Amino acid sequence: MNSNQNRLLQSSVFPLFFLLIIWAVFYFDVTYKLNLHQYGLMPLSARGLIGIFTMPLLHGDLGHIASNSLPLLVLGICLFYFYREIAFKVFFISYISCGVLVWLFAQRDIHNSVHIGASGLIYALAGFLVVSGIIRKHKALFGISLLVIFLYGTIIWGVLPSEYQKAIHYIEDGKNISWEGHLFGFLTGVCLAYVYRKIGIQQPVYSWDINNDDDVDESNPYWLEGTEEENKPKDDTQQDAFKNTSDNPYTVNYTFIPKKDVE
């Protein structure tokens, strides 16, 4: 097993473990009819505060959990493979922040509906991977951004209010989704991409990209500098010799010879 395969295996451990927890919760809920969705997140409700921690673990039916499983696994592996230094921070901050924002700002309807599902976390991971790859300007990370857009680009419509999603036929009539969870999850991911932009893989810096203008001594511009010999200080011997020749100048005598004498 080479280093890349080993790294991929290590990056898959936590996403698979988290996915196993979600499926275990769903299995016990369905098998023993525990009605766990009552512990989902209810906005601006003391009883619904527990949903900040339980919302991503709870799902309404098999279709709901199945639709969330694959993107959660793929995005989670990408996060831990390419951003291993900050992967746990991004994951758990997204987990908690999404729930807190939904609890604070999501609308509470007359039916006291609860928010459940890991889709908010999925939107956070997608937002982080897309934006982080763009602002870091690293080829591999930018490629991951394009891959996420290609695979899950259409989920951007999920941040719109439900009535707009129904109008464009993104969701079926009579189906309700936690679009606030999608929106706040995506915004959380974008913010984390900016906050952690200096940590982890960075764009390579080449020698020709380095600006050395700060090293120039503007008090002595290079265009006013003389040659090395011109700037070299004269020693005392040279200065004394020059002084002596100035005090006692040489005499040069010229002799004129007529042209006829030359012939």
Label each PLM-derived region with a short phrase.
Residues 1-7, 159-263:
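C-terminal transmembrane module of polytopic alpha-helical membrane proteins
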Residues 8-90, 103-115, 168-173, 177:
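N-terminal TM1-TM2 helical hairpin plus the immediately adjacent luminal interfacial "cap"
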Residues 117, 123-171:
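Multi-pass alpha-helical transmembrane bundles in non-GPCR membrane proteins
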